[in-house]
Amino acid sequence: MGSLGEEVQVIIVGLGIVGLAAAIECREKGHSVHAFEKSNILKSIGDCIGLQSNATRIIKRWGDGAVHEALRPWIVSSKEIRIHNSSGRLIIRQDLSEVCEQPNYLLPRSELIRVMYEHALKIGVEISLGVEVCEPSEDEEGASVVALTRDGERQIVRGDFIICSDGVHSKMRKAIMPQPVEPRPSGYAAFRALVDTETLKGDPEASWVFEGVEENDRFDVFFLSGAQIALQSCNKGKVFSWFCIHQDTRNLLDVWTSPADPNEMLDLIKVWPIGQRLWSVIRHTQPQKFINYPLLNHKPLDHWVSSHGRLILIGDAAHPLSPAAGQGASQGIEDANVLATSLSLAGRQRVSLALHVAERIRYARASAVQLISHRVNEGWRNQDWDAYEPNEQNIASLPLETWIYGHDSQAYTEQEFEMVVRAVQEGEEYHATNLPDKLRVQLGIRNVDVKEPLQNKSP
């Protein structure tokens, strides 16, 4: 990078969905962005990803609506989530009409990354693929990293600050939290994949899964004590995906790419009364796309911002979520939006302040969703689903609450910015109102650690 201009110079490390969201948000709000990804190509494995309206209202602003138009075929048309026990008996119909009042998306992860990547390039984000980043450092004036290409070239890249969006195994996190952050094994893992729709169409035993999807996509969940399967269609039945949370009997490595044998899935569900019906769909997963990865429990970190206020963690690097919440990417997109908005309101001379403001606004809310996701999973595991009656406490329902999906993070940031600035500058706590107070107490959510008043430091 050349000499620093008037724009905020943003370095992003990690270009998954959240890193791309940060790149787009920062660039569309007038900042200069250089993003790095160690892979040569942007790719994603696994199944589909859902984005609720707390994220899609952010995406709808990108490119004056152009990104939303590209994603329009993937707007969720499901009217309900149907929850069943292992015999296939319908336990609960969870209405989605309020959740889907604003557009929600459900689409293959790879398709979302493609659309976001193309838009990022179009608006002028500088993207370096196949480049590993190391040695992050900061001072009161800015931050830098060392970029290592596959050809062995070593280059120091300097900017105003660094967004660390390099995932749950973040290497950048050490620069912010020197002590290692060790997740706790949950004892569970997840199979997940896309189904080969073309072969699925030709299987008469699987014809049931296409019923009604041209009008309303399917979202079915099946429970057995100790396991859970979700089966979804999107784009009016053009794509089917599934995932299964199950006991981890292999002590899997904590990576997304642990290979799996489809027969493991068959062994798991063949004892279910509904097992053969589900297998008629799942067997159409291509073996090379069949993955199995462990689910780990992560405590909220103490903080996300570095000592000089020039590095910030976002997304899974800051607050990994269990799949139960369906909010992993959506919360990361909120991070990106709040950070970019805070930068625009603060200006280049107050970059460190902007990072602390974004952390204060997001910390309690993201921590609450993180803890809820773990608690919901634990509740599911301890329930006797075959004995479950619909009039019991509705523990089967997914956490689809208005305070989560109805939130407008940009409007909230613009409204609260000056109040948070005062709290940061005076070294006081900021009590965020973007989560319910009652829930904050129930979950034991605290505010982010209060540091030395920022006004006593250099900008």
Curated annotation (Swiss-Prot):
<dbReference type="GO" id="GO:0004497">
    <property type="term" value="F:monooxygenase activity"/>
</dbReference>
<comment type="function">
    <text>FAD-dependent monooxygenase; part of the gene cluster that mediates the biosynthesis of paraherquamide, a fungal indole alkaloid that belongs to a family of natural products containing a characteristic bicyclo[2.2.2]diazaoctane core. Within the pathway, phqK catalyzes spirocycle formation through two parallel pathways in the biosynthesis of paraherquamides A and G, using as substrates paraherquamides K and L, with paraherquamide L, bearing the dioxepin, being likely the favored substrate.</text>
</comment>
<keyword id="KW-0274">FAD</keyword>
<feature type="binding site">
    <location>
        <position position="316"/>
    </location>
    <ligand>
        <name>FAD</name>
    </ligand>
</feature>
<feature type="binding site">
    <location>
        <position position="50"/>
    </location>
    <ligand>
        <name>FAD</name>
    </ligand>
</feature>
<dbReference type="InterPro" id="IPR002938">
    <property type="entry name" value="FAD-bd"/>
</dbReference>
<feature type="binding site">
    <location>
        <position position="18"/>
    </location>
    <ligand>
        <name>FAD</name>
    </ligand>
</feature>
<keyword id="KW-0560">Oxidoreductase</keyword>
<feature type="binding site">
    <location>
        <position position="109"/>
    </location>
    <ligand>
        <name>FAD</name>
    </ligand>
</feature>
<feature type="binding site">
    <location>
        <position position="47"/>
    </location>
    <ligand>
        <name>FAD</name>
    </ligand>
</feature>
<comment type="similarity">
    <text>Belongs to the paxM FAD-dependent monooxygenase family.</text>
</comment>
<dbReference type="GO" id="GO:0071949">
    <property type="term" value="F:FAD binding"/>
</dbReference>
<comment type="pathway">
    <text>Secondary metabolite biosynthesis.</text>
</comment>
<dbReference type="InterPro" id="IPR036188">
    <property type="entry name" value="FAD/NAD-bd_sf"/>
</dbReference>
<protein>
    <recommendedName>
        <fullName>FAD-dependent monooxygenase phqK</fullName>
        <ecNumber>1.-.-.-</ecNumber>
    </recommendedName>
</protein>
<feature type="binding site">
    <location>
        <position position="37"/>
    </location>
    <ligand>
        <name>FAD</name>
    </ligand>
</feature>
<comment type="pathway">
    <text>Alkaloid biosynthesis.</text>
</comment>
<feature type="active site">
    <location>
        <position position="192"/>
    </location>
</feature>
<feature type="binding site">
    <location>
        <position position="133"/>
    </location>
    <ligand>
        <name>FAD</name>
    </ligand>
</feature>
<feature type="active site">
    <location>
        <position position="232"/>
    </location>
</feature>
<dbReference type="Pfam" id="PF01494">
    <property type="entry name" value="FAD_binding_3"/>
</dbReference>
<keyword id="KW-0503">Monooxygenase</keyword>
<keyword id="KW-0285">Flavoprotein</keyword>
<dbReference type="InterPro" id="IPR050493">
    <property type="entry name" value="FAD-dep_Monooxygenase_BioMet"/>
</dbReference>
